[in-house]
Amino acid sequence: LAPREQVRIAQLLLSVAHEKSDLEVATAFRNLGITTKNDSTEFVAKFARLMFGPLKPEHLDHGWHRAMHQQDRVVYFPKDLSMVYRTSLLLRGLAVSLQMNYSVCEQWKIHAQGAIDRHPQLVQQLQAEEDAATNGPTVDRPTFAA
């Protein structure tokens, strides 16, 4: 993966590992390019936690999944995340077979932080891009003397 994708995936894993708010987790996921039909922040955050967080009792409930998918659905899943997600599922499947509750983001947290630490300028650049997208372009405003 290119450094940009490494950092974005690391930010997603860390947002889940550090139990950030739905908005922060969903933003990290959206920054990778995921899009959903209704753009539901709650759905995107739940989906990220389901993929990379610890297995929770509701994850084993078909009704929970049904309700989640009635709320929203994935329209585009980023290709850069496909292999990461598949690896996550394989590790979780192995852990479940061994009767372990394996949290991918918890296990990969140190490596995710390492990816961020290796690219500090890129992290700043991505944050500036995110701020610009959130706040709109910066406009020089005239100042008037009193």
Predicted regions located by residue number:
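Helix-rich C-lobe and terminal helical cap/extension of kinase-like folds
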Residues: L1-A146
